[in-house]
Every structure is written in C-alpha cells, then in structure tokens.
C-alpha cells in the first residue's frame, strides 16, 4: 500500500484558488468520510488551513485514487478541470518527507512557525475519530509527530520572531517579563493593530483599550482581541495607567510627544512605558526615547529585527532536512507503512 499526499498550498495556488478548496473545520470529518468512500482510497487524513489543503491517503492503486479525488474536488462546484495544475502529488517516501517538513514548519509561509503542528494533530485526530484511518495512517502520523517534535527541539528553526507583531511582543516580554496584567492602549484599528493586539492578548495582556477615529471600527477590533473600545478624543486620559502603547493611525503627524509624556511621569511613578510605533508617517516623536523609563521601537527597527530572525531560520533549513532524513531511516526501518 502506498502513501500519497495530494494538495495545494501557498506556493502553488493564490489565495483566491486556495479558498475555493478550503475545508471548514466543522466539515473535516464529513469530507474525510467522503474521500475514504472513493474508489481506491483505503485510509485518509484531510488537512485544511489558510495556506494549504492536503489529502494524505493510502492506496493500492494510487493513480486511480488520485483521479477520483481530483474529480471529487473539481466536480464539486469548486473548480474547473484546468485547476488540477494547482495541485501537487507526492508518493511513498516523498510523501512521508513532505508530511515531516509540514509538521516542522519547513513548508510554511512563515518558515518555522509552530501553529501548523497543532493543526496537523487536529486533522489527524478528526480522521481517527471519523474512522477513516487504519494501521498505516495511524503509525505513520504518530511517528511523523515524533519527527516533527525532534526537528523543533534539536534546531533553532522556530527561534526568533518573524513578524512585526511577534517582534513587538518579544520586546515587551523583555521589558515586563510575564505580560499577565499588562495594560495596553492601541491607537488605530487597521491590520497591524489587529495582529499586534492579538499577539499581546495571547501572551496574557489584559485591559486592552482600542481607540480609533471611527468608533465602530474600534468596537470591531476590540471584540476580536478581547479589548474595550474607547472614544478617540479621550485616549490621552488612559496614558497614566498604560504599560504598552501600539500606535498605528493614519495621522500625518506625531500624536505622542515629549510634551505628552513628561507631565505624566510622576503620576505614573516612573514605571516603564513601551511604545510601539508601526505607523508611516510616524505617530510618536523619536525624542521620547530620551525619557529614562520609555522604550520606543518604530516600524523600521521592528522590521529589521524580524528580517534578522528570518535569515537565521533559513540557515537552519539544511540542518532540519538532515534531521528528517536521519529520523525517517530510524523510525521507519522499512517502507511497509508508506510504500509497499
């Protein structure tokens, strides 16, 4: 029985194609059962994230099964026949290696990201619960999880923040340590505010306030990140009690200056204040960094730190590939589970 991976991802298909084939999480079980019922498919696992949709299946007639799976997707109102060109197929050891690279974050849009490991685990557990796996799929995925974990523990592929939002969070943790109880003020309700706000909330920040000229947008963002919307004309009243400020408005001038902060120092008891300026033009005057307890990072500095982390991760790829090759030889001493 041969293991096959049939799918598309961020490298082979743009988002407007990927979204047509995406399988919502609440439909993964049903989709797995439908694919398992196709001719030639003996076992299967369906993985669907924002950046990929993949079918891992086992078959004694893999080419025949692949035709039926493609027909299922393309003939299900999701695409035309020429969309088959967006799909890739890996068989045998190549399919196993691909699964291990996916689990390790080597095949992710953000190299080394960790979320995919949990997403694959969820996909496998759903398939297991749906009764569409058997010995080959179960043993292969369990061993692949071990390999994926080994790559992460024996390499630095996941080290360092690679997005502006995650860099900002890491810097905040360097200043405050545990972010539990940290109070945050977000100025602006765009994409950068959302990403950074979510990252801070995920690390334990509490009392997140969102101010935007459009109060409706502030309410919307606050709802996404567990925060509270406040009117834009009163955000200055909150600075005395805030630990972190994320500035990302469209204002054409600085809205936080030395004159804004100096009168507040005593009432703040000279507590540390972390300012994240991710707006262009800048929202925070650079000279506020001269205030002893103020830490200011702008978009250029954050981007530079993220780029350095990306370069560092790329240098780890060959090491990770070697770990995967060696681990496949160790954990799969024969090819019975994926290529027989």
UniProtKB/Swiss-Prot annotation:
Pathway(s) annotated for this protein in UniProt: Porphyrin-containing compound metabolism; protoporphyrin-IX biosynthesis; 5-aminolevulinate from L-glutamyl-tRNA(Glu): step 1/2
EC number: 1.2.1.70
UniProt binding sites for substrate: 49-52, 108, 113-115, 119
GO molecular function annotations of the record: glutamyl-tRNA reductase activity; NADP binding
Keyword match Oxidoreductase: yes
Record-listed NADP(+) binding positions: 188-193
Key words, A-Z: NADP, Oxidoreductase, Porphyrin biosynthesis
CDD domains, per the entry: NAD_bind_Glutamyl_tRNA_reduct
Superkingdom of this protein's organism: Bacteria
Site (Important for activity) location in chain: 98
Keyword DNA-binding: no
Record GO biological process: protoporphyrinogen IX biosynthetic process from glutamate
Catalytically driven reaction(s): (S)-4-amino-5-oxopentanoate + tRNA(Glu) + NADP(+) = L-glutamyl-tRNA(Glu) + NADPH + H(+)
Protein purpose: Catalyzes the NADPH-dependent reduction of glutamyl-tRNA(Glu) to glutamate 1-semialdehyde (GSA).
Oligomeric and partner information: Homodimer.
Membership in a protein family: Belongs to the glutamyl-tRNA reductase family.
Protein name: Glutamyl-tRNA reductase
The organism of origin for this protein: Akkermansia muciniphila (strain ATCC BAA-835 / DSM 22959 / JCM 33894 / BCRC 81048 / CCUG 64013 / CIP 107961 / Muc)
Source lineage: Bacteria, Pseudomonadati, Verrucomicrobiota, Verrucomicrobiia, Verrucomicrobiales
């Amino acid at each position: 029985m041969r293991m096959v991976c049939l799918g598309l991802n961020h490298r082979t298909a743009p988002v407007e194609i990927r979204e047509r084939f995406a399988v919502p999480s609440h439909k993964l079980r049903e989709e797995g059962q439908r694919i398992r019922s196709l001719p030639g498919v003996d076992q299967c696992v369906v993985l669907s994230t924002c950046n990929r949709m993949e079918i891992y299946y086992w078959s004694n007639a893999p080419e025949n099964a692949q035709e039926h799976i493609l027909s299922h997707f393309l003939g299900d109102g999701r695409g035309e026949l020429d969309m088959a060109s967006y799909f890739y197929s890996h068989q045998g050891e190549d399919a196993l290696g691909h699964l291990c690279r996916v689990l390790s974050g080597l095949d992710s849009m953000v190299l080394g990201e960790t979320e995919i490991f949990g997403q694959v685990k969820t996909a496998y557990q759903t398939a297991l619960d749906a009764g569409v796996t058997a010995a080959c799929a179960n043993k292969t995925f369990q061993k692949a999880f071990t390999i994926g974990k080994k790559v992460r523990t024996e390499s630095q592929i996941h080290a360092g923040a690679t997005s502006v939002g995650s860099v900002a969070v890491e810097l905040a943790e360097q200043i405050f340590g545990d972010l539990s109880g940290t109070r945050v003020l977000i100025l602006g309700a765009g994409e950068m505010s959302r990403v950074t706000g979510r990252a801070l909330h995920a690390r334990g920040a509490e009392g997140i306030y969102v101010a935007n000229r459009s109060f409706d947008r502030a309410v919307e963002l606050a709802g996404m990140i567990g925060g509270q919307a406040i009117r834009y004309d009163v955000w200055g009243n909150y600075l005395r009690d805030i630990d972190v400020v994320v500035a990302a408005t469209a204002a054409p001038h600085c809205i936080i200056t030395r004159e804004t902060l100096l009168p507040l120092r005593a009432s703040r008891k000279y507590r540390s204040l972390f300012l994240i300026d991710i707006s262009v033009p800048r929202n925070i005057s650079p000279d506020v960094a001269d205030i002893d307890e103020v830490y200011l990072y702008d978009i250029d500095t954050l981007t530079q730190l993220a780029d350095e982390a990306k370069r560092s991760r790329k240098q780890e790829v060959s090491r990770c590939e070697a770990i995967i090759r060696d681990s496949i030889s160790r954990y799969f001493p024969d090819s019975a589970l994926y290529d027989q």
